[in-house]
Amino acid sequence: VLESSELAKKKGLSIVSGLCWRYDYGVRETINRILDGAIGDVVSIQENYLTGPLWHRGNDPSWSQMEYQLRNWIYFTWLSGDHNVEQHVHSLDKAQWILGDTNPIAAVGLGGRQVRTDEKYGHIFDHHAVCYEYANGVRVHAYTRQQAGCANDTEDYVFGTKGSCQVLKHEIRKPNGEIAWKYSGPKPSMYQVEHDELFRSIREGKPINNGHYMALSTMVAIMGRMATYSGQRVTWEQAFNSTVDLSPKAYEWGDVEVPPVAMPGITKEI
C-alpha cells in the first residue's frame, strides 16, 4: 500500500482514504490548535469508541460460506481486521494526527468475546483495550467495545502540560477546567468535504495523497489487534514485518474456513 501511494504521488494521482475526520472542519481546527501548542506538550491521549452491537445480514441456504462472510464482512478478520481496525481506526487516526503521524514503538492490550458469542458473529472480539507506547513517552489508551446495554462514548481526550481537549466537542480547556476555546465555524458534512476536496484537487492539478497516513494508521490498528489476540507486547517492527496471512486459501464461491476465536497467551499473531 505504501508503494502504491508513492507510485500515485509520482504519477500525480490523488488518493482520499476515507479516514473522514481529517476532513471535518471543526476537528481540523481543533487539532491544528493542539499542534500549535494550545494545550502545551501532549502527554497522553484516551481514545474511546464504545458503542452497541452492529448489524448482521442474516444467512440464506443458497449462499456459500464465501458469500455469507462477504455479506457479514465485519465479523471476519480477513475482511475487517476486527472492529478495532474497521471502526476504531478512525479514533486511532486522530491520535496519530495529533502526534505528527509518528509510529508507536509498542502496544500492549487485552480483549475478548464475552457477550457476542454466537457463531453467526464470526470470530472477532466484542471489546479491546490497548495502550500504545511512543518514543517520546506519550501513551495512547485506546478502548473500543460493541456490546449492548453498556455506557457508550465516542470521543478523543487529549491531555497536555497546559490544558486538555475533547476533539469531537471541538473544545479546549485550561488546567482549571475553564473553556479556553471552542470552535464556532461552519460545519459541513465531512463526507461531502472529502469529495469536494478530491474533485477540486483533480480539477486544479494539485493532487491530494492520504495514502501514507492511511496505511500507517491502519497498521497501528492492526498492531493493536495483534496485541489483544496474542496477549503479548507487540513492537512496531514485529507488526510491520509480520508474515501472518489472514486471507482465505482461495477466492472462490465455496467453503471458507472460519479461524477459531483468538485466545490471549495461546494465539500467535506475529
Task: Provide a role label for each language-model segment.
Residues 1-10:
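Serine-hydrolase-like catalytic core of hydrolytic proteins
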Residues 15-18, 141, 210-211:
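Short catalytic-loop micro-motif centered on adjacent basic/acidic residues
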Residues 9-17, 21-122, 150, 155-157, ...:
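Predominantly a Rossmann-like dinucleotide-binding segment in NAD(P)-dependent oxidoreductases
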Residues 131-136, 159-161:
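Active-site beta-strand termini and strand-to-loop segments that position acidic
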Residues 10-15, 138, 205-207:
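Short, surface-exposed connector motifs at secondary-structure boundaries
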Residues 140, 148:
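Phosphate/diphosphate-binding loops
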Residues 79, 86, 90-103, 108, ...:
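C-terminal helical cap and adjacent loop that interface with cofactors, partners, or active-site loops
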Residues 46, 108, 131, 141-143:
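Structured core elements
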